[in-house]
Amino acid sequence: MLYLLAQWLHFEGFSNLIRYQTFRAGATLLTALVIGLIIGPRFINMLRVRQGKGQPIREDGPQSHLAKRGTPTMGGLMIVTALTLSLLLWMDVTSRLVWACAVVTLGFGLIGFLDDYDKVTKYAHKGVPAKVRLAGEFVVAAFAAWLAVGETNLYVPVFSNLYVPLGPFYYLFAIFVIVGAGNAVNLTDGLDGLAIMPVIIAAGTFAIIAYLAGRYDFATYLGIPHVKGAGELAIFCAAMMGAGLAFLWFNAPPAAVFMGDTGSLALGGALGVIAVAAHHEIVLAIVGGLFVMEAVSVIVQVAVYKRTGKRVFRMAPIHHHFEQLGWKESTVVIRFWIVSIVLALIGLATLKVR
């Protein structure tokens, strides 16, 4: 909004400054951070009063988690609010790619909110039926894919100019990437600070990737897909980082609030659509490797148990497996953060390695 206003009124100095995406990305990050820190305490108090018992805690989980009873959930409302307000100030509202990201963030956030609300009101672990939730996610993802997808070639990193033409099937692939990313982050969100920091790291990584993909000179030099307007995605990533850092302030152990499905689905879906829009879906699987590992651990656990009656892991998702092995919650979280940083560096290396 400020971007278009400055262009329309021809503000000297500020108009020149605001046209730089790097400046707007930094401003968006700081704005989202400040907004999140300001509204955070009020949101938490409101959620605590309205929810009473807070998020249901699994009885069959690690016994240390029982101390978290009474902690409110739906903290994702704070994240989405800070992210949205900062974007309205600094993004180019004419950008089709940013609107695709906004559709997924708000759409997935709403689905997550309904799921959280059902769990809190019934004080049960099962919220909205999985089939209903997934159907909603696929509808939202399909609309976002229609907005975000231009070329239908799948870019394969590391190999020089290797693209796999998928044609119309690319849209199906894009939808599965978006839905898969949303649910993978959702499965990761099981410990204080575990999901939000890897999301921040992934968003920071894709801010760099999106900016480079949006610049024809850099994209040509690096041999990566050039996506016109992709630089605006860096501003969206910056908003995710700022809002995420603000949430982490309150989610640091012992957490004062959980993001719930409201936040995890919104942020995961956003990462998915950003990767699709920037044509770096495979790189997302690398950068978000922690989320992939968490999701795969659940799939393997369920599949093997149904077939043999035996468990591969002591408990799934895999972060609970390490807790059952005797790792403290803080140890699991910090070590998983380190894994995320390493994976982000590997993801960035694919931009240059050929």
UniProtKB/Swiss-Prot annotation:
<dbReference type="InterPro" id="IPR018480">
    <property type="entry name" value="PNAcMuramoyl-5peptid_Trfase_CS"/>
</dbReference>
<dbReference type="GO" id="GO:0051301">
    <property type="term" value="P:cell division"/>
</dbReference>
<comment type="pathway">
    <text>Cell wall biogenesis; peptidoglycan biosynthesis.</text>
</comment>
<dbReference type="Pfam" id="PF10555">
    <property type="entry name" value="MraY_sig1"/>
</dbReference>
<keyword id="KW-0132">Cell division</keyword>
<keyword id="KW-0472">Membrane</keyword>
<keyword id="KW-0808">Transferase</keyword>
<dbReference type="Pfam" id="PF00953">
    <property type="entry name" value="Glycos_transf_4"/>
</dbReference>
<feature type="transmembrane region" description="Helical">
    <location>
        <begin position="282"/>
        <end position="302"/>
    </location>
</feature>
<keyword id="KW-0573">Peptidoglycan synthesis</keyword>
<feature type="transmembrane region" description="Helical">
    <location>
        <begin position="138"/>
        <end position="158"/>
    </location>
</feature>
<feature type="transmembrane region" description="Helical">
    <location>
        <begin position="193"/>
        <end position="213"/>
    </location>
</feature>
<dbReference type="InterPro" id="IPR000715">
    <property type="entry name" value="Glycosyl_transferase_4"/>
</dbReference>
<keyword id="KW-0997">Cell inner membrane</keyword>
<dbReference type="GO" id="GO:0008360">
    <property type="term" value="P:regulation of cell shape"/>
</dbReference>
<keyword id="KW-1133">Transmembrane helix</keyword>
<keyword id="KW-1003">Cell membrane</keyword>
<feature type="transmembrane region" description="Helical">
    <location>
        <begin position="162"/>
        <end position="182"/>
    </location>
</feature>
<dbReference type="GO" id="GO:0005886">
    <property type="term" value="C:plasma membrane"/>
</dbReference>
<feature type="transmembrane region" description="Helical">
    <location>
        <begin position="256"/>
        <end position="276"/>
    </location>
</feature>
<keyword id="KW-0961">Cell wall biogenesis/degradation</keyword>
<protein>
    <recommendedName>
        <fullName>Phospho-N-acetylmuramoyl-pentapeptide-transferase</fullName>
        <ecNumber>2.7.8.13</ecNumber>
    </recommendedName>
</protein>
<dbReference type="GO" id="GO:0071555">
    <property type="term" value="P:cell wall organization"/>
</dbReference>
<feature type="transmembrane region" description="Helical">
    <location>
        <begin position="97"/>
        <end position="117"/>
    </location>
</feature>
<dbReference type="GO" id="GO:0051992">
    <property type="term" value="F:UDP-N-acetylmuramoyl-L-alanyl-D-glutamyl-meso-2,6-diaminopimelyl-D-alanyl-D-alanine:undecaprenyl-phosphate transferase activity"/>
</dbReference>
<dbReference type="GO" id="GO:0009252">
    <property type="term" value="P:peptidoglycan biosynthetic process"/>
</dbReference>
<feature type="transmembrane region" description="Helical">
    <location>
        <begin position="230"/>
        <end position="250"/>
    </location>
</feature>
<keyword id="KW-0812">Transmembrane</keyword>
<comment type="similarity">
    <text>Belongs to the glycosyltransferase 4 family. MraY subfamily.</text>
</comment>
<feature type="transmembrane region" description="Helical">
    <location>
        <begin position="331"/>
        <end position="351"/>
    </location>
</feature>
<dbReference type="GO" id="GO:0008963">
    <property type="term" value="F:phospho-N-acetylmuramoyl-pentapeptide-transferase activity"/>
</dbReference>
<feature type="transmembrane region" description="Helical">
    <location>
        <begin position="27"/>
        <end position="47"/>
    </location>
</feature>
<keyword id="KW-0479">Metal-binding</keyword>
<dbReference type="GO" id="GO:0046872">
    <property type="term" value="F:metal ion binding"/>
</dbReference>
<comment type="function">
    <text>Catalyzes the initial step of the lipid cycle reactions in the biosynthesis of the cell wall peptidoglycan: transfers peptidoglycan precursor phospho-MurNAc-pentapeptide from UDP-MurNAc-pentapeptide onto the lipid carrier undecaprenyl phosphate, yielding undecaprenyl-pyrophosphoryl-MurNAc-pentapeptide, known as lipid I.</text>
</comment>
<keyword id="KW-0460">Magnesium</keyword>
<keyword id="KW-0131">Cell cycle</keyword>
<dbReference type="InterPro" id="IPR003524">
    <property type="entry name" value="PNAcMuramoyl-5peptid_Trfase"/>
</dbReference>
<feature type="transmembrane region" description="Helical">
    <location>
        <begin position="73"/>
        <end position="93"/>
    </location>
</feature>
<keyword id="KW-0133">Cell shape</keyword>
